[in-house]
């Protein structure tokens, strides 16, 4: 079930405060955040947000196409180790 339209999008208050301060000053330095559930809002366009994936912060440059998505969608948490190698069958005669 999606979030109620009446409530509006969720953005961590401290993250939104940092974005607004940087917009007023005109700065564009990366912002570290652990809030993967925060939604991308138009105020974030042009900023780089370092989203934590459980191991390190992944820098994500925010563009217009990302509006309405969550920050966690752009920072994968799982690493693909590859498929298992085929092992030769023992005792098989060719």
From Swiss-Prot:
Residues 73-94 are annotated as: Disordered. InterPro entries: Ribosomal_uS19, Ribosomal_uS19_bac-type, Ribosomal_uS19_CS, Ribosomal_uS19_SF. It comes from the Bacteria. One of its GO terms (molecular function) is structural constituent of ribosome. One of its GO terms (biological process) is translation. Signal peptide: none annotated. GO terms for cellular component: cytoplasm; small ribosomal subunit. SUPFAM superfamilies: Ribosomal protein S19. Keywords: Ribonucleoprotein, Ribosomal protein, RNA-binding, rRNA-binding. Belongs to the universal ribosomal protein uS19 family. Protein S19 forms a complex with S13 that binds strongly to the 16S ribosomal RNA. PANTHER family: RIBOSOMAL PROTEIN S19P FAMILY MEMBER, SMALL RIBOSOMAL SUBUNIT PROTEIN US19M. This is Small ribosomal subunit protein uS19. It comes from Kosmotoga olearia (strain ATCC BAA-1733 / DSM 21960 / TBF 19.5.1). The lineage of its organism: Bacteria, Thermotogati, Thermotogota, Thermotogae, Kosmotogales.
